[in-house]
Amino acid sequence: MGDVLVVFRVLPEDVDNDLSRLESKIREKLNGVCKINDIKTEEIGFGLKALNVQAIMPDEEGMADRVESILAGIEGVSQVDTKDISLI
């Protein structure tokens, strides 16, 4: 099996959350679980921003769900959605 690139949209709990701090927490929690390819800020509207996390992981059953659960458990995260999955 190969690897997959999964894009997660991470929404903060509040518009006032420090996204750079949240990005650091994401990198810390996912260290050793998967490889972070990139993290980009996405403007949602009305001052709300989200982080699009591109993660590379093995194409194993349940791996994307595991990473999504880790992201959802980070303090300051309101919601996590899987936006895209691509085989690489």
UniProtKB/Swiss-Prot annotation:
Transmembrane segments: none annotated. GO terms for molecular function: translation elongation factor activity. Gene3D superfamilies: 3.30.70.60. The keyword Protein biosynthesis applies. Keywords: Elongation factor, Protein biosynthesis. The keyword Protein biosynthesis applies. InterPro entries: eEF-1beta-like_sf, EF1B_bsu/dsu_GNE, Transl_elong_EF1B/ribsomal_bS6, Transl_elong_EF1B_B_arc. Promotes the exchange of GDP for GTP in EF-1-alpha/GDP, thus allowing the regeneration of EF-1-alpha/GTP that could then be used to form the ternary complex EF-1-alpha/GTP/AAtRNA. HAMAP family: EF1_beta. Belongs to the EF-1-beta/EF-1-delta family. This is Elongation factor 1-beta. It comes from Picrophilus torridus (strain ATCC 700027 / DSM 9790 / JCM 10055 / NBRC 100828 / KAW 2/3). The lineage of its organism: Archaea, Methanobacteriati, Thermoplasmatota, Thermoplasmata, Thermoplasmatales.
